[in-house]
Every structure is written in structure tokens, then in C-alpha cells.
Regions:
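Acidic, metal-coordinating catalytic segment for phosphate/diphosphate chemistry
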Residues: 1-27, 33
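Short, surface-exposed beta-strand-loop junctions and turns on beta-sheet-rich folds
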Residues: 15, 45-47, 143
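A glycine-rich, hydrophobic loop/mini-helix early in the fold
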Residues: 25-57
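Residue-level structural signal for beta-strand termini and adjacent loop
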Residues: 13-14, 43, 67, 121, ...
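Nudix hydrolase/Nudix homology domain
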Residues: 51, 90, 97-164
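The catalytic Nudix box helix
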Residues: 39, 56-89
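Short, solvent-exposed loop/turn elements at beta->coil junctions and helix N-caps
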Residues: 14-17, 90-95
Length: 164
């Protein structure tokens, strides 16, 4: 991707990460009816940040794939959620805080069921209030992914856009 989020070429993801090149990803924030955010604990088998708490679901956008389609696929693959409607929240620019990813943020709101994590991807997960996440970030930052901390520090995941 160039600095304006336009594709330049296709490369293996491992090489993109090694060279810290800009690329595309999605982040999905799943909210309960009470306005709590679902956090997932990444599987210990993950290459990056195993065993750390992360946002509800995320993934890389493959060449030729739409961000919304990637977000829906990640929800299904990681949390067994078959969603039809996601709300696009915003696009975060590629930066060190996003892992050099142009990140499309989506929200799935007012979920009235507990997600069922795919154990190959996610160890466990729970819904947390803004106050609980604030405490985790303040006291247990080392247990969280940099992505979760970065989103919190940019005003997500409990913004003023009314997701909850």
C-alpha cells in the first residue's frame, strides 16, 4: 500500500511485517446489549502476542477482498458469529501504533448472546465495561495486545459515535 492506502503490489504477509510495510486490516468491536465490549484472549499458539487480551476480532484483508467481507469472515472464523450487518466506524491510518496497517474499524452492536470462540484462535472471551478495560490498561498493560491499547488511546472502543 502507498501512503494513501492504494495497492502497489502483492507480497507475502511475513515479508510485509518484516519490512514494516503498510497493509490493510480490519478490527471488529462486538458490544453487548449493556454496552460492554467483548475482548478475546488470543490462543497461545498464535505467532504474535499469544495469550494476550485483544479486541473482539481482527484480521488482514487479502488482495481483492473488501474490508467488510474480511470483517464478517473473521467474526465467523474466530467467534462463530454469523453477522449480516456491521457498522463501519472509521479507517485508522497506517502507523507504528497500528502495526503499519490501514485498519478499517467495524462495530457489531447490541449482541444478546455470548460468542463461542474457536479454540484454535481464541482461548476465551468476556464482555467488559469501559471502566474494567480502563483498569486493565492502567494496571495490566502487559497482558493486552498493542492494538487494544492503541485503539483505547485513540478514543476507541468506547467513543462518542454511539455504538453502545
Amino acid at each position: 500500500m502507498d501512503p494513501e492506502d492504494r495497492p502497489l503490489m502483492v507480497m507475502p504477509l511475513t515479508e510485509i511485517h518484516r519490512q514494516l510495510l503498510p497493509h490493510r486490516s480490519v478490527a471488529v468491536l462486538v458490544y453487548s446489549q449493556e454496552g460492554k465490549l467483548y475482548l478475546q484472549k488470543r490462543s497461545r499458539g498464535k505467532r504474535h502476542f499469544p495469550g494476550r487480551w485483544d479486541i473482539s476480532a481482527s484480521g488482514h484483508v487479502e488482495p481483492g477482498q473488501a474490508a467488510r467481507d474480511t470483517a464478517l469472515a473473521e467474526l465467523s472464523r474466530k467467534l462463530n458469529i454469523k453477522a449480516e450487518q456491521l457498522r463501519f466506524v472509521r479507517l485508522l491510518p497506517a502507523s507504528p501504533g497500528t502495526g503499519f496497517e490501514f485498519t478499517s474499524i467495524f462495530a457489531l452492536e447490541r449482541v444478546h448472546w455470548q460468542p463461542e470462540p474457536n479454540q484454535d484462535e481464541v482461548e476465551e472471551g468476556f464482555f467488559y465495561s469501559a471502566e474494567e478495560i480502563r483498569y486493565l490498561i492502567r494496571e495490566f498493560r502487559e497482558l493486552l495486545t498493542p492494538r487494544l491499547v492503541h485503539l483505547w488511546e485513540t478514543g476507541l472502543p468506547f467513543p462518542t459515535w454511539g455504538a453502545v
